[in-house]
Amino acid sequence: EKDSQKQVSAGGLTKYMTLALVLTRYADQLDNTFQMPFAISDYVHNTDNADMRSGETFTYREALYAMLTRNANEAAMGLAYTLSNGDLAGWVSQMNTLSQQIGTTGSTWTDACGLDSGNTTTAVDMYLILRYLMRFDAFVEISGAPTFTMPAKEKHAKSFVLLSQNVAL
């Protein structure tokens, strides 16, 4: 209970809220594809990534695996950009609305991946978000995966393995 309501920087935990929005709106469409937009490449350059390159085609599911196994910023931003038709501010607004619907009271979301220092949350809010995510079979499956093999893509001649950064696995 001590400090459980204290607002702290959300950092990479922001991706869980992006994941919640994706699963809420698109859980039955995870095999749909999108092309990684060039527009987000500068924003995520030299940050946590899964080497998902602009112009390559991915399924939503592949992006979710990249987000959860490698904390991949380009996956979160690419999905947000694509699913919002380039309206990242609108996506963030939807994140904040869903967050409040889940019951969070101390969280503020300002981007889809956590690079912006304005993303804040509390321990209680993260518990609520994770409890919400547990409703989705895709989250349970993806979050428990120690590895994911990304298929060959337009700029990757061979498949490659993403090793989870989750030390609990």
Where are these regions (language model features)?
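Active-site-adjacent loops and short helices of periplasmic peptidoglycan-processing enzymes
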Residues: 1-124, 133-137
